[in-house]
Amino acid sequence: MNALAQKTPSPPTLVFTEAAVRKVKGLIDEENNPYLNLRVFITGGGCSGFQYGFTFDEAINSDDLVIEKQLEEEDDDEGGTGQMALVKLLVDPLSLQYLQGAEIDYREDVSGAQFVIRNPNAKTTCGCGSSFAA
């Protein structure tokens, strides 16, 4: 059998949903600094062993995974302005090991608004969803 025929497409490294992109764009606009990027990282701690972190960062390290998403600028009236904005998500290599295949989303509901990470690598998660065990 041909080795190429057995090759399956690899899943996306990380999914950055449109809702998350729009929220990040809004937060960057509030800071009035177009050079900001959203950095997602993993640190030790939390009730399950690891916890997610989010911060804004102007610096892009040479070994960062950079996910770029284009988003049409919204207008106060109807629809968009036709101009495109670029939003970047940054992940360092160590954190990427734990975030491979995860989805970063933004959710608003009756309980509040927050960034949500759906992580297929998490074996267990805490009730609040901000920490996990791998």
UniProtKB/Swiss-Prot annotation:
| Pfam families membership | Fe-S_biosyn (PF01521)
Q: What does this protein do?
A: Required for insertion of 4Fe-4S clusters for at least IspG.
Q: Which GO terms describe its biological process?
A: iron-sulfur cluster assembly
Query: Assembly and interactions?
Result: Homodimer.
MF (Gene Ontology): 2 iron, 2 sulfur cluster binding; 4 iron, 4 sulfur cluster binding; iron ion binding
Q: Name the cofactor(s).
A: iron-sulfur cluster
> Which key words are in the record?
Iron, Iron-sulfur, Metal-binding
UniProt xrefs under InterPro entries: FeS_biogenesis (IPR000361), FeS_cluster_insertion (IPR016092), FeS_cluster_insertion_CS (IPR017870), FeS_cluster_insertion_RrpA (IPR023063), HesB-like_dom_sf (IPR035903)
Protein family according to the UniProt entry: Belongs to the HesB/IscA family.
Protein name from the UniProt record: Iron-sulfur cluster insertion protein ErpA
Q: What NCBIfam families does the record point to?
A: iron-sulfur cluster assembly accessory protein (TIGR00049), PRK13623.1 (NF010147)
**Free-text remark on how the cofactor is bound:** Binds 1 iron-sulfur cluster per subunit.
Any one annotated GO CC term: cytosol
Q: Where does iron-sulfur cluster bind?
A: 47, 126, 128
